[in-house]
UniProtKB/Swiss-Prot annotation:
The lineage of its organism: Eukaryota, Fungi, Dikarya, Ascomycota, Saccharomycotina. Glutarylation at Lys-92 (H4K91glu) destabilizes nucleosomes by promoting dissociation of the H2A-H2B dimers from nucleosomes. Residues 1-20 are annotated as: Disordered. The keyword DNA-binding applies. The modification N6-succinyllysine is found at K32, K78. The modification N6-acetyllysine is found at K6, K9, K13, K17, K80. Core component of nucleosome. Nucleosomes wrap and compact DNA into chromatin, limiting DNA accessibility to the cellular machineries which require DNA as a template. Histones thereby play a central role in transcription regulation, DNA repair, DNA replication and chromosomal stability. DNA accessibility is regulated via a complex set of post-translational modifications of histones, also called histone code, and nucleosome remodeling. Coiled coil: none annotated. InterPro entries: CENP-T/H4_C (IPR035425), Histone-fold (IPR009072), Histone_H4 (IPR001951), Histone_H4_CS (IPR019809). Changing K92Q: Mimics acetylation; does not show increased sensitivity to DNA damaging agents. It comes from Saccharomyces cerevisiae (strain ATCC 204508 / S288c) (Baker's yeast). This is Histone H4. Residues 17-21 bind DNA.
């Protein structure tokens, strides 16, 4: 142990600075067949071509709000790791209770 307390780098040598990949337009990773499979699971038979971009936009805004709330819970607990309970509580706050992950 280096004696620097919980999670602190302290003085002296820090870790290597890593280059982070700049993420842009990752929502396109939700492919057309993936959206089609989700719709099929929901009982949809035919899908308009305009739906795919709309679904991506709705999914992105939903995930942004859940992640924002989850990170708020994490920061309040003075942690750096988002836990499954943080996500469960964030979903519960938005009125979408999720069972099976504790809490």
């Amino acid at each position: 142990m280096s004696g620097r307390g919980k999670g602190g780098k302290g003085l002296g040598k820090g870790g290597a600075k890593r280059h982070r990949k700049i993420l842009r337009d990752n929502i396109q990773g939700i492919t057309k067949p993936a959206i089609r499979r989700l719709a099929r699971r929901g009982g949809v038979k035919r899908i308009s071509g305009l739906i795919y971009e709309e679904v991506r936009a709705v999914l992105k805004s939903f995930l942004e709000s859940v992640i924002r709330d989850s990170v708020t819970y994490t920061e309040h607990a003075k942690r750096k790791t988002v836990t499954s309970l943080d996500v469960v509580y964030a979903l519960k706050r938005q009125g979408r209770t999720l069972y099976g992950f504790g809490g």
